């Protein structure tokens, strides 16, 4: 049940225009948002009832870490006292979600319940989807090294699913992550693969009596409360790829150059070598060899299939100075890819060809312009400028990036936007359970009533040791 901190109770009738009260709509908006979010319930949420604007830097708290102390009769108090304050980090409020719509005069006589169902519910589902996508979109920041991630890309099956989860559990334990409150968030593909494994569905081996199978949920697996989220990072087949093959065998942990048969790789492109199956990319390309950004995790056979995820072009021609500046938060135009093989929602997208210049995002929305160009919206504003023609975009590899995490790995930080009453506009700001929503209403002559819903937020990585990425 939602607990409202700043709500006023109103009553309205089914066909009463008094139902157009912003406070009532804001309360319903929060209820719908709360019901439709998945990932936001599994992370740290921080809210303060202080009005903020888009782009403001606000302070979030990272839980403090204390050390073991031993006391004797002669121990002085000064050596025992530890700082109990959580460390402070700055978080930009760079996620401004908005849904605006018009209720036409002919619709305004409908009941409040009908108006909510037709207009408000689908908009709040869209905002909930956006919140989950920006949270899951930060999963790449936890990829770490081959030793600190579990599984293989696009190759989870009934034979290795259990071992993958054992590996993820061990990695978190080795990082001293809390053992309580762990969550595993799976893509639909990863869930379907896990359900093929007997150890996840047999009651005697699950440890939960098998009730999860009866309710079509994965339930509690190896210490993880397990969920399927449709917004989990995942790239399906159909990406713009080319194929190559290795020229010899390579041992696990090999970190040198890799010889390819034809070598059409460009620096910066994601390259997946069968047998290794990690989210690797090329940092160097010579006539017949490439160098990857990290050592191989697993051994690679001779003539192993090499999948190259082809770069596409950045088109900033509509921007002043033909550059998407650092901090740019709107749609980015990409083109130059093979017809109908553009970037996908949930796919990684990187810029930069070296470790120093690389910055990586997740695509959270795609709108096609034509068969070879599209608009993409990223999980957060650009960290660095991207220039038209000079910079390439590098779409990520097939497979899923599923976070296995504790609550304090990520934080959703929200602040209320200012109420703006006047000039025919009525506004209400409501908050509950660490989330604030603003609803504004204004009549437009002969047009109807414009309703605008806003939510201002930021996402912070609190502790990289509290999340491991499960590749699937």
Where are these regions (language model features)?
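N-terminal "assembly arms/tails" that initiate or stabilize quaternary assembly
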Residues: 2-91, 467
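Short, low-complexity, charged/polar segments at coil/turn and helix-coil boundaries
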Residues: 42-54, 59-69, 159-204
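Short acidic, glycine/tyrosine-flanked loop/strand segments centered on an H-E-D-like triad
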Residues: 85-111
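Hydrophobic, glycine-enriched assembly/anchoring segments
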Residues: 103, 440-472
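Alpha-helical scaffold segments that mediate packing/assembly in large oligomeric complexes
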Residues: 110-177, 188-191, 195, 283, ...
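Autoprocessing Asn-cyclization modules and mimics
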Residues: 156, 200-203, 213-388, 470
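Long, low-complexity, polar/charged, intrinsically disordered or flexibly structured peripheral segments
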Residues: 376, 381-382, 393-414
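A conserved acidic, glycine/proline-rich C-terminal tail/linker
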Residues: 431-440
């Amino acid at each position: 049940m939602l607990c409202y901190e700043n709500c006023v109770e109103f009553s309205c009738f089914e066909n009463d225009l008094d139902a157009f009260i912003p406070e009532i709509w804001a309360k319903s908006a929060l209820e719908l948002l709360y019901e439709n979010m998945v990932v936001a319930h599994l992370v740290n949420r921080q809210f303060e009832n202080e009005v903020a604007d888009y782009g403001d830097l606000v302070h979030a708290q990272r839980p403090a870490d204390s050390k073991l102390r031993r006391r004797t009769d002669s121990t002085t108090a000064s050596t025992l006292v530890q700082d109990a304050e959580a460390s402070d980090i700055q978080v930009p409020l760079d996620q401004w979600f908005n849904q605006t719509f018009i209720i036409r005069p002919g619709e305004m006589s409908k009941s409040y319940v009908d108006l909510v169902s037709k207009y408000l519910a689908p908009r709040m589902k869209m905002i909930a989807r956006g919140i989950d996508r920006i949270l899951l979109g930060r999963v790449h920041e936890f990829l770490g090294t081959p030793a600190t991630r579990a599984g293989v890309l696009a190759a989870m099956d009934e034979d290795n699913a259990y071992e993958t989860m054992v590996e993820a559990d061990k990695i978190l334990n080795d990082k001293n992550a809390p053992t309580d409150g762990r969550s595993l968030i799976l893509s639909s593909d990863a869930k379907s693969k896990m359900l093929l494994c007997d150890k996840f569905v047999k009651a005697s081996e699950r440890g939960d009596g098998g009730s999860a199978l009866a309710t079509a949920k994965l339930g509690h697996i190896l210490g993880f409360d397990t969920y399927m989220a449709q917004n989990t990072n995942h790239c399906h087949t159909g990406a713009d790829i080319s194929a190559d093959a290795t020229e010899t065998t390579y041992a696990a942990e090999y970190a040198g150059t890799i010889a390819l048969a034809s070598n059409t790789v460009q620096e910066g492109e994601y390259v997946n070598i069968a047998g290794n199956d990690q989210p690797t990319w090329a940092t160097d390309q010579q006539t017949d060899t490439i160098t990857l950004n990290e050592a191989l995790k697993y051994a690679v056979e001779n003539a192993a299939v090499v999948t190259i995820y082809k770069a596409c072009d950045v088109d900033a021609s509509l921007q002043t100075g033909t550059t998407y500046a650092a901090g740019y938060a709107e749609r980015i135009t990409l083109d130059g890819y093979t017809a109908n093989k553009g970037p996908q929602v949930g796919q990684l997208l990187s810029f930069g060809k070296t470790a120093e210049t690389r910055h990586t995002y997740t695509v959270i929305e795609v709108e096609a312009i034509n068969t070879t160009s599209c608009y993409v919206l990223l999980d957060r504003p650009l960290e660095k400028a991207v220039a038209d023609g000079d910079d390439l975009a590098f779409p990520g590899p097939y497979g899923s990036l599923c976070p296995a995490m504790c609550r304090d790995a990520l934080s959703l930080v929200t602040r209320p936007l200012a109420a703006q009453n006047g000039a025919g506009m009525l506004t209400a700001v409501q908050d509950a359970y660490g989330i604030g929503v603003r609803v504004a209403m204004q009549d437009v002559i002969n047009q109807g009533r414009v309703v605008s819903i806003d939510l201002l937020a930021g996402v912070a990585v609190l502790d990289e040791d509290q999340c491991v990425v499960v590749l699937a």
